[in-house]
Amino acid sequence: EMCIETDNDVDDAIIVGAGKLGKALLTYGGFKDCGMNIVAAFDIDEEVCEEDYGGKRILTMDKLMDLCERMRVRIGIIAVPAENAQAICNLLIESGILAIWNFAPVHLDVPEGILVHNENLAASLALLSKQLKEKFDANT
């Protein structure tokens, strides 16, 4: 396992976007091993809200700010389409989020002091493909 050393504190995080990616992140058990706890997910689709998914709750967006403030959540995960990502980012920051793990394929404009890590799945796969081709070409 590749986890960064932590101080044994567990950092709570939330996910916005409870589609396939959001649900996969919500139920992934490996975050606990790295000192992370996903406390809830949020979505605009009321069909998926209020359900229990893998022992975690999917809540309506109107509950996001209260939960973040009450639980002092400082990490937000964005798993929404690109066209919604900036508005979600702004809401997360308004709710006290200080660090964002962004899965939307878009650059987020954030104030100074807010940490953003962009996870570009397409670029990661393209890099892996390129490395495979280089390895294959080197062996022929």
Q: What does each of the following model-derived ranges do?
A:
Residues T6-N8, F31, E51, D109:
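Generic structural signal for beta-strand residues in well-ordered domains
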Residues M2-I4:
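Short, small-residue-biased leader/transition segments that mark boundaries at the very start
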Residues D9-D45:
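Glycine-rich adenosine-cofactor-binding loop
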Residues D7, D33-G35, R70, E94:
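Alpha-helix termination/capping residues and helix-transition junctions
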Residues E50-N139:
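Phosphate-bearing ligand-interacting subdomains
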